[in-house]
C-alpha cells in the first residue's frame, strides 16, 4: 500500500471540511493539510432546490476547488474506509494509508428514508447532495407533470415552490400542523402557507404518508395517506430530513451522541485524542437548554469548522463554541422568512418564561416607494431580565441580513433595554425608517410589557447589567 503523511487530515469536503482545511492552513501555516473527498465536484448544498427546479444548472452550483488548493491545501479524490486512532492512520478505498497528527471528521449527512412500503421503487427520490444524484433527480422529474413531495421542512417547501414555478402540479404533504415548524411560530408559518397555496400547490398538513403506491413495473404512481386517501402522481420525492453520516466514525469506535452525531466538546474535540468532528456529522447542543439537537445548517457547520481548526494544536480560541443558535432563512414566493434562536412554541415546550412582541412596518421609507415590502419582526425575551433569546422576521430581501444581526444580538445576550439605544444606519431605499426600525420597535414593545410605562431608566440599566 502507498503511504502518505499529513499534519492535518480532513475527511470530507463539504462546507465544514473545506472551511476546516482553509482555516487550519491560515492559522497553522507550517503544517501540511489535506482534504479527502469522495466526490470530484462539490455542490453548494443550500442551492440544490434551485438546481432541481431548473433555475440554475448543477455545473453553476459548484464550489470551486481553488478555494482550498490556492491556500496550499491538498485535495484528494478518494474515500476513507478505515481509521486506526492508535496508529494515527486512515486507510482509503484506493489502497492508500494516510498518516496524520490531527484528524477531522467532516463526513456530513445523508437523507432520511422513512420505513414504509414502496420506498425502493423506481421514481421515488431523496434529495442527495452530490452532483450525479442531483442531475439524476432533475432528469427523472423533468417530464413528470404531477409530483408528490413528502416533507414540509425547508427542502420540501423550496423544491415544491420551484416545481410550481415551472408549471408542474405539486402535492406537498407534511405530518406537522404547520410548515417549517422547527423554525417558525404559527403566524409566520401561516403566512408562508398562504403564499404556497396561492402558487397552486396542494398543501396537506397533519397528514401521515403510510405507503408509496407502485405499479407492476415497481414504479411509484403515488402515495396513500393514513386516512386511506390515495394521491396519484408521476413521481414521489421524500424530503423528510437528514441524519449524520457516522458509519466510519462508529467503525473506528468514536462515541455517538443522542441524536446520532459524533460526540464533541465545545472545541469540537471527540473522545479520541487528536480527533475532531465538525458539521452535520457532529453532535449539536442547544445554546439555551443545553439539550442535544438534530440541527443541520451550513452556517453552523462553518462556525464549528473555524473553532476546530483554530483549536487543533492548542486552545487559543477563547470564545469556544458555546452552543447552536438555530438561524434559518428561506424565500417563499417573493417573501423572505427568517428565524433565530428560540421560537415561542419551543419556549412553551421547554417551560421558559418569556415575553413576546410583534411589530409590523416597511422595509423602505416612505412606504410609498416602489418595491416596498411589509416587514414583520417578532422578538422573544426571557421575562426575568429581558434578554433576547429568539426572533422571527418576514419581509423583503433585507430580512436576510437582519436575521444575522438578530443572531449576533442573541449570541451576545443583549437585552431589550440595550436594543432600544442601538445606533443603526438607515436609508430610504434600503431600510425601514429610523423612527420605526422594526427590531427596535419590537424591543420597545417587549420592554413595556416587562417593566411598564413608568419603569425608570436607571432600574432598566441595573437589570441589564445582570444579563
Label each region the model flagged:
Residues 2-74, 112, 154, 162-187, ...:
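Beta1-alpha1 glycine-rich phosphate/pyrophosphate-binding loop at the start
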Residues 11, 98-108, 231-241, 305, ...:
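Short hydrophobic core segments
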Residues 11-13, 25-30, 38, 240, ...:
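Flexible, glycine-rich terminal cap/loop adjacent to redox cofactors
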Residues 30, 71-91, 98, 166-264:
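A Rossmann-like FAD-binding core segment of flavoenzymes
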Residues 47-56, 155-213, 295-300, 318-320, ...:
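Rossmann-like dinucleotide-binding cores of NAD(P)H-dependent redox enzymes
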Residues 86, 96-140, 429-434:
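Glycine/serine-rich phosphate-binding loop and adjoining beta1-alpha1 elements at the start
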Residues 120-143, 219, 229-310, 405-409:
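FAD-site-proximal beta/loop scaffold in flavoenzymes
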Residues 264, 278-342, 430-453:
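A conserved FAD-binding loop/helix module that cradles the flavin
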Amino acid at each position: 500500500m502507498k503511504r502518505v503523511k499529513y499534519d492535518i487530515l480532513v475527511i470530507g469536503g463539504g462546507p465544514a471540511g473545506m472551511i476546516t482545511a482553509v482555516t487550519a492552513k491560515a492559522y497553522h501555516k507550517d503544517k501540511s493539510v489535506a482534504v479527502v473527498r469522495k466526490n470530484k465536484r462539490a455542490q453548494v448544498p443550500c442551492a440544490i432546490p434551485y438546481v432541481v427546479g431548473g433555475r440554475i444548472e448543477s455545473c453553476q452550483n459548484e464550489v470551486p476547488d481553488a478555494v482550498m488548493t490556492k491556500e496550499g491545501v491538498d485535495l484528494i479524490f478518494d474515500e476513507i474506509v478505515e481509521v486506526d486512532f492508535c496508529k494515527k492512520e486512515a486507510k482509503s478505498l484506493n489502497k492508500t494509508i494516510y498518516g496524520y497528527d490531527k484528524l477531522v471528521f467532516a463526513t456530513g449527512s445523508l437523507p432520511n428514508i422513512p420505513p414504509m412500503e414502496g420506498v425502493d421503487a423506481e421514481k421515488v427520490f431523496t434529495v442527495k447532495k452530490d452532483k450525479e444524484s442531483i442531475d439524476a433527480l432533475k432528469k427523472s422529474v423533468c417530464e413528470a407533470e404531477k409530483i408528490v413531495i413528502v416533507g414540509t421542512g425547508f427542502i420540501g417547501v423550496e423544491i415544491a415552490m420551484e416545481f410550481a414555478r415551472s408549471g408542474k402540479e405539486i402535492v406537498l404533504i407534511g405530518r406537522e400542523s404547520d410548515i417549517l415548524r422547527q423554525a417558525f411560530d404559527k403566524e409566520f408559518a401561516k403566512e408562508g402557507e398562504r403564499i404556497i397555496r396561492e402558487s397552486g400547490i396542494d398543501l396537506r398538513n397533519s397528514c401521515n404518508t403510510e405507503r408509496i403506491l407502485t405499479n407492476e413495473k415497481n414504479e411509484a404512481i403515488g402515495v396513500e395517506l393514513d386516512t386511506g386517501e390515495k394521491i396519484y402522481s408521476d413521481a414521489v420525492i421524500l424530503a423528510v430530513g437528514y441524519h449524520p453520516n457516522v458509519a466510519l466514525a462508529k467503525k473506528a469506535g468514536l462515541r455517538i451522541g443522542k441524536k446520532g452525531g459524533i460526540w464533541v466538546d465545545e472545541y469540537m474535540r471527540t473522545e479520541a485524542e487528536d480527533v475532531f468532528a465538525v458539521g452535520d456529522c457532529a453532535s449539536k447542543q442547544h445554546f439555551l437548554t443545553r439539550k442535544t439537537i438534530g440541527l443541520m445548517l451550513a452556517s453552523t457547520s462553518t462556525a464549528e469548522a473555524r473553532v476546530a481548526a483554530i483549536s487543533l494544536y492548542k486552545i487559543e480560541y477563547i470564545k469556544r463554541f458555546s452552543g447552536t443558535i438555530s438561524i434559518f432563512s428561506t424565500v417563499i414566493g417573493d417573501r423572505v422568512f427568517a428565524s433565530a434562536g428560540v421560537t415561542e412554541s419551543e419556549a412553551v415546550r421547554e417551560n421558559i418564561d418569556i415575553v413576546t412582541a410583534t411589530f409590523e412596518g416597511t422595509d423602505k421609507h416612505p412606504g410609498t416607494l416602489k418595491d416596498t415590502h411589509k416587514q414583520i419582526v417578532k422578538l422573544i425575551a426571557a421575562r426575568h431580565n429581558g434578554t433576547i433569546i429568539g426572533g422571527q422576521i418576514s419581509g423583503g430581501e433585507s430580512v436576510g441580513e437582519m436575521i444575522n444581526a438578530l443572531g449576533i444580538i442573541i449570541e451576545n445576550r443583549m437585552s431589550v433595554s440595550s436594543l432600544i439605544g442601538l445606533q443603526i444606519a438607515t436609508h430610504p431605499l434600503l431600510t425601514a425608517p429610523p423612527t420605526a426600525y422594526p427590531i427596535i420597535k419590537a424591543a420597545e414593545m417587549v420592554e413595556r410589557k416587562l417593566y411598564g410605562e413608568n419603569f425608570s431608566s436607571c432600574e432598566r440599566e441595573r437589570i441589564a447589567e445582570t444579563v
